[in-house]
């Protein structure tokens, strides 16, 4: 979440310099989600199916509703010949994703089990850099000639932001809060990681 969409945080340095530098061959904007601070699976459900979680008050569709196949964006892409992979570097059982992704028509689900024990972590969670390196690895091993769709739910910036062993490199001026410093420092690390991913795919023939 970029707090500049709702305010003007004053930080000791820019926390998204690479993304801010992109002005060509890119579409930028904002989106609204049905939840904040948790319940990521609800946002996933809305994005992938186009349905609203308002139909499921107090419920998480992945957990309570997924007992059969669901038409989704993945279905449309599969009909067009895409290889469809879901990735989330956490336990496959969280929010019953292993079941939900299968019912959403994904060919494969890459969970924390497919990441090396030596993969870079921050605050105990897989870093965006390690996550994106896994995307590149997966792409390079995809079915030859097959178009490729990968739905990725990262973990690096998951709350909370009170880990005393994490070294924050950015200070949020005007806030006496280690949590804010950690959050914006993590965003900077995300910006560096997305730079790696975008630069890689800029060199790939479409």
Across the structure, where does each feature detected by a protein language model lie?
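Solvent-exposed soluble domains appended to multi-pass membrane proteins
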Residues: 1-206
């Amino acid at each position: 979440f970029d707090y500049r969409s709702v305010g003007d945080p004053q930080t000791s340095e820019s926390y998204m310099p690479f993304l801010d530098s992109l002005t060509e061959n890119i579409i930028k904007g904002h989106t609204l989600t049905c939840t904040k601070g948790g319940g990521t699976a609800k946002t996933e459900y809305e994005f992938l199916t186009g349905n609203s979680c308002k139909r499921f008050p107090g419920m998480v569709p992945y957990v309570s509703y997924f007992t059969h196949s669901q038409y989704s964006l993945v279905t449309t892409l599969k009909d067009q010949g895409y290889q469809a992979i879901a990735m989330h570097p956490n336990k496959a059982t969280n929010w019953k994703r292993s079941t939900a992704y299968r019912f959403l028509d994904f060919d494969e689900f890459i969970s924390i089990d497919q990441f090396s024990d030596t993969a870079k972590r921050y605050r105990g969670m897989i870093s965006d850099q390690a996550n994106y390196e896994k995307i590149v690895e997966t792409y390079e091993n995809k079915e030859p000639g097959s178009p490729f769709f990968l739905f990725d739910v990262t973990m690096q910036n998951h709350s909370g932001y009170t880990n005393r062993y994490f070294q924050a490199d950015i200070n949020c001026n005007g806030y006496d809060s280690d949590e804010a410093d950690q959050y914006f420092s993590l965003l900077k690390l995300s910006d560096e990681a997305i730079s790696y991913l975008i630069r890689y795919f800029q060199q790939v023939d479409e």
